[in-house]
Amino acid sequence: MANLATLDHPYLPQSASLLFDAKAKANLTFEDIARHIGRNEVATAAIFYGQAKASKEDVVKLAELLRLPAQALEMQMGGFPDRGRSVDMPPREPLIYRLYEIVQNYGYAYKAVLNEKFGDGIMSAISFSTNVEKETDDDGNNWAVITLRGKW
């Protein structure tokens, strides 16, 4: 169950502590919460970390599920996300560092293949979605499958 030590994350918004504390008290996963608000689990987690904007409907549904005062939650989440400041560069958290390492090692290869397939341009991180799946192979090994989908 993902939780948050706010002292380790000084750049997160005020709402992060409130949301993560309520999530822990309710013993909910991001998948549980995502199902309730009608988003995927990565988009839901991004709201908790202040990296995605919650709609008014999201705030109402979060308040309902997490038993939080909707007005207070809306006040804390009403601004625009301050994206990209929540992670030190290079990252120190091992899993986040591995994702960074993937971009270091494969970034230019991704760029070359994307340019060959789509021409000159960039993949949007705004018109964007992502998903995480778990696969188990025939030998019982678990594999993480991360899909990145951005408008070209």
From Swiss-Prot:
Keywords: Lyase
Catalytic activity: cyanate + hydrogencarbonate + 3 H(+) = NH4(+) + 2 CO2
GO biological process, alphabetically ordered: cyanate metabolic process
Alphabetized Pfam families for the sequence: Cyanate_lyase
SUPFAM superfamilies: Cyanase C-terminal domain, lambda repressor-like DNA-binding domains
Coiled-coil region list: none
Keyword Flavoprotein attached: no
Protein family membership: Belongs to the cyanase family.
Protein name: Cyanate hydratase
Species of provenance: Uncinocarpus reesii (strain UAMH 1704)
Lineage per the UniProt record: Eukaryota, Fungi, Dikarya, Ascomycota, Pezizomycotina
